[in-house]
């Protein structure tokens, strides 16, 4: 919801752990050696940023769609996000990528704030 409130369109929300679990028998002892409880992702994009990135440097369209990965382990969740500013270093889209990165970081912070304000939050 926080991504959509910040004008990012969530395209897909795969349950990666569920998909990987289908391979547990085939992979045997090599399956989930880190004992992760869950892996989910959110694939999203903002049309305005996609247009601006394509205008600045079409090669940076690799940034769209963006994704966040949520890794659950031992009762906590880590949020993983590849920083667009790192990908766009030296590109004509570098400044825009930094702006995009900040917009996503703000959306993540808003989501965490909402969770912190929730009565169900620990």
Where are these regions (language model features)?
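Ser/Thr-rich, low-complexity intrinsically disordered terminal regions
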Residues: 1-59, 66, 94-111
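Beta-strand/loop substructures that line and gate deep hydrophobic ligand-binding cavities in soluble
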Residues: 64-94
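Short, highly charged C-terminal tails/helix-capping segments
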Residues: 114-122
């Amino acid at each position: 919801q926080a991504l959509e409130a910040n004008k990012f369109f969530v395209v897909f929300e795969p349950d990666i752990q569920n998909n990987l679990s289908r391979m547990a028998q085939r992979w045997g002892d090599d399956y989930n050696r880190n004992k992760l409880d869950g892996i989910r992702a959110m694939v999203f994009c903002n049309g305005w940023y996609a247009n601006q990135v394509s205008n600045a440097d079409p090669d940076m369209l690799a940034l769209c769609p963006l994704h966040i990965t949520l890794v659950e382990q031992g009762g906590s969740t880590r949020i993983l996000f590849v920083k667009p500013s790192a990908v766009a270093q030296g590109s004509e889209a570098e400044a825009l990528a930094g702006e995009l990165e900040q917009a996503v970081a703000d959306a993540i912070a808003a989501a965490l704030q909402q969770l912190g304000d929730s009565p169900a939050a620990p």
